[in-house]
Each structure stands twice: as C-alpha cells, then as structure tokens.
C-alpha cells in the first residue's frame, strides 16, 4: 500500500514536470484540489480527445469521492476545452477551474434533482 502511494506520488511528480498546469479558480479544500490536478494531469497525458479527458476526470473523481447514492446529494461534472464560456451552480467548496497545457478544465459538484417528466 505504501509502495503504491509512493509510486503514484512519483508519477504525479513526473507528470507535473511534463505538463504545464495552473489553478485559475478553486473553491475546494487543498487535498481535493491536489487530487483534481493529479487526475487532470493523468487524463491529459493518457487521452487526446476532449470527451475522453473529461470522462476520465469525472469518472476518477467520482471513484475517489463517491456519494451515498442519493439523487439529491450531488454529482461531479467536468468540462474540458480550449474555448468556451460557462456559468454553473456548485456545492460549497466543490469547484475548480484549472488550465492543463492548452486545455481549460472545470470540475464541480452540484445537486442532482430527480427529474419528473411533465414537471409533476
């Protein structure tokens, strides 16, 4: 277990030296922020298509910080791109906007209200 964590730390250091990253805005605890950066660095290193990068970041962050399964608790969302505008609502201390190489990455958690067809 300790070897695995050390190996992940070494991989993170290598990726940080290979990729440029900058946190633009963050309303996350530092440990969550560091995990988001590490996951984003791995995604950019591993994938070329933006949809794959976004899916990987969301999927890995969901695995790292799983919810209880309640629909009203909230879920993570991720946007990756070079040029876009956004306006999102997020849970308190659950938002980060960073730049990795030439890509902007936004990761946030918001409550997911159960959908009722017809607005009932």
From Swiss-Prot:
It comes from the Eukaryota. Transmembrane segments: none annotated. Keywords: Cell projection, Cilium, Cytoplasm, Cytoskeleton, Dynein, Flagellum, Microtubule, Motor protein. One of its GO terms (cellular component) is motile cilium. It holds the Pfam family Dynein_light. Its main location: cytoplasm. The keyword Cytoplasm applies. It is found in: Cytoplasm, Cytoskeleton, Flagellum axoneme. One of its GO terms (biological process) is microtubule-based process. InterPro entries: DLC_sf (IPR037177), Dynein_light_1/2_CS (IPR019763), Dynein_light_chain_typ-1/2 (IPR001372). The keyword Cytoplasm applies. Consists of at least 3 heavy chains (alpha, beta and gamma), 2 intermediate chains and 8 light chains. Belongs to the dynein light chain family. This is Dynein 11 kDa light chain, flagellar outer arm.
């Amino acid at each position: 277990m300790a070897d695995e964590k050390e190996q992940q730390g070494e991989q993170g250091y290598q990726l940080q030296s290979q990729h440029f990253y900058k946190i633009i805005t963050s309303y996350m605890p530092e440990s969550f922020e560091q995990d988001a950066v590490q996951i984003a660095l791995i995604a950019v290193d591993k994938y070329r298509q933006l949809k794959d990068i976004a899916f990987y970041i969301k999927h890995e962050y969901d695995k790292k910080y799983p919810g209880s399964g309640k629909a009203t608790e909230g879920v993570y969302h991720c946007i990756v791109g070079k040029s876009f505008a956004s306006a999102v609502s997020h849970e308190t201390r659950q938002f980060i906007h960073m730049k990795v190489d030439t890509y902007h990455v936004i990761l946030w958690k918001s409550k997911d209200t159960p959908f009722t067809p017809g607005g009932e």
